[in-house]
Amino acid sequence: MAVKVGINGFGRIGKCVVRAAINNPDVEVVAINATGDNEGTALLLKYDSVHGTIPNEVTFDDDNIYVDGKKIRVFHDRDASKLPWSEEGVEIVMECTGKYRDAEEAKVHLNQPTVKKVLISAPGKNEDLTMVMGVNQDMYDPAKHHIISNASCTTNCLAPFAKVLCDEFGIKRGMMTTIHSYTNDQKILDARHKDPRRARAAAMSIIPTTTGAAKAVAKVLPQLKGKLDGFALRVPTPDVSATDLVCELEKPATKEEINEAFRKAAAGE
């Protein structure tokens, strides 16, 4: 039986989660919380300039949107404590607003009787566990881990190959650079921003800025705590990012040995 999911926040991540869930028989999105009107929410789900148009029929009424006739209830409340997830039987809340990243705030979803878990789609604070699939999912204990961070996109990129190097050769220290597509946090044209570098036009600039991914990776690979640092280059592309890691290994390794280690990891050996 499919798990019933509610999504708080219908930005880039929230929308992608719904799109992915449409064709997943194990997941049923039954409710979302979006700040805009239902017509706009339906249009944003149907059409995407980066990922294309979904083939499904998307319609709406005053209280819901429908995907191929299947109802998804839509709430409109900026206060997460007022969201009636249990009315739709929500079991897992995907926290995708970027606002409730601290578990002390995200736990408000657990006040609803049917909600069992909260998954934060960003780096968390005070969370029960930060989990990157393929790296540390074995650490998950359903009896005690109820508020879980999925980390950042860059951490999800960095952690898998850092794990291979760490397991096979050991890492003494390293420096990471992420070449990162622009995001909605940046400006289309020059405008004020708390980070003056991000105030420059996103589609016209290569913008050096900070990233917490190198340090956050220690949440999923504790043996790397204090060993990695890094920064980001925001580049004028709408999608796809790359991560470059330069590191000193604890034991010698040839190019062939490193490539073979990655080949085996990719094959699940």
Give the positions of each predicted feature.
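N-terminal Rossmann-like NAD(P) cofactor-binding subdomain of oxidoreductases
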Residues: 1-199
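C-terminal substrate-binding/catalytic lobe of Rossmann-fold NAD(P)-dependent dehydrogenases
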Residues: 168, 174-177, 185-269
